[in-house]
């Protein structure tokens, strides 16, 4: 819904900032010296010098653009963002993240496919990608609540 409401770039930026804020929270960053890894004066000093990096696969830094916007969470240490066109070809970390994201999404689509309201879309077979059967199901049944309405569905 956020993608349809805000646009893909802004929604991706806010989602990335949510993930970064959650990772920093789990590490105790920004929570004071009593939390997480910030339990000693040495670790507190290290946190003051801590740098967070992010590599985006593509030319657009949607993370920095979303930083400090109304919808973005507070992020104690914003990421230093590097954009790499075709990053999955040149960086093992980006390639690994791309595989993990695709496998995770495909598994999620199979779980959705098991629910009766999504059966017509055959997501167990096409994982939501624009196969002919998937497009025909959208024409026949209309988009589901999970479809991005801003995307060219048919």
Where are the regions that the model predicts?
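RNase H-like, Mg2+-dependent phosphodiesterase core
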Residues: 1-154
């Amino acid at each position: 819904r956020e993608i349809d409401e805000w646009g893909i770039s802004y929604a991706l930026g806010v989602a990335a900032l949510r993930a970064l804020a959650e990772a920093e929270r789990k590490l105790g960053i920004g929570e004071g010296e009593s939390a997480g890894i910030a339990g000693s004066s040495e670790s507190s000093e290290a946190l003051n010098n801590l740098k967070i990096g992010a590599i985006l696969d593509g030319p657009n830094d949607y993370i920095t653009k979303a930083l400090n916007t109304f919808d973005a969470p507070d992020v104690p240490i914003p990421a230093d963002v590097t954009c790499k066109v075709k990053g999955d070809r040149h960086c093992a970390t980006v390639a690994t993240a791309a595989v993990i994201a695709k496998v995770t999404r495909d598994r999620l689509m199979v779980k959705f496919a098991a629910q009766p309201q999504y059966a017509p879309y055959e997501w167990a077979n096409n994982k939501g990608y624009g196969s002919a059967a998937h497009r025909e199901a959208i024409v026949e049944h209309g988009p589901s609540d999970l479809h991005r309405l801003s995307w060219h569905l048919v």
